[in-house]
From Swiss-Prot:
It holds the Pfam family DUF179. It comes from Rhizobium meliloti (strain 1021) (Ensifer meliloti). NCBIfam families: PRK00228.1-4. Transmembrane segments: none annotated. HAMAP family: UPF0301 (MF_00758). Disulfide bonds: none annotated. InterPro entries: AlgH-like. SUPFAM superfamilies: VC0467-like. GO terms for cellular component: cytosol. This is UPF0301 protein R00917.
Amino acid sequence: MAKNVLHTIRERGFLDGQFLIAMPGMFDTNFARTVIFVCAHSEDGAMGFILNRPQRLTFPDVLLHLQLLDPDEAIRLPSATREFQIQAGGPVETGRGFVLHSDDYLSDSSIPVSDDICLTATLDIVRAISRGEGPLKATMLLGYAGWGPGQLEAEITQNGWLTCPAQEELIFSRDLDEKYDRALALMGVSPAMLSTDSGHA
């Protein structure tokens, strides 16, 4: 994980622990109909993870790529481990893996990003998950979404995003297709109510 990302996470801001929900007029196709969990926000910028974009790689693919097991071992992995979900976390540093997880797993490299959720970006958690010793709730994301100083605030002011407090159940839900509508429902909003001219929360 890049040092500047770690620094950003340690600097807390008012959007920490919030969902960003893309408005219909989102100009950047990377973020159309996305739900993003903001892990860090400060005067230096912001960092978060897209929660509803699939990733073609499987967890065994990741283990093989990292040389944490050989092909014969991959075949013998428990079904729960083989089916561990990998998601596309954002367009920045797409070759880097990050694990968002419940706070029942902590290592020296785990960073709290909300009251109940941590972020770990080292191989120890990948090994733990492969052995069935990982956190109760977790999702692995490749890449992240990042904003420079003032950039996210400007996008919100320009009606690019709705914001609301994050919900743990939605963060770890495996049903990616429903996350956008479910995030809107947290605010009492339906997609039909939105237009490109709507205001922000």
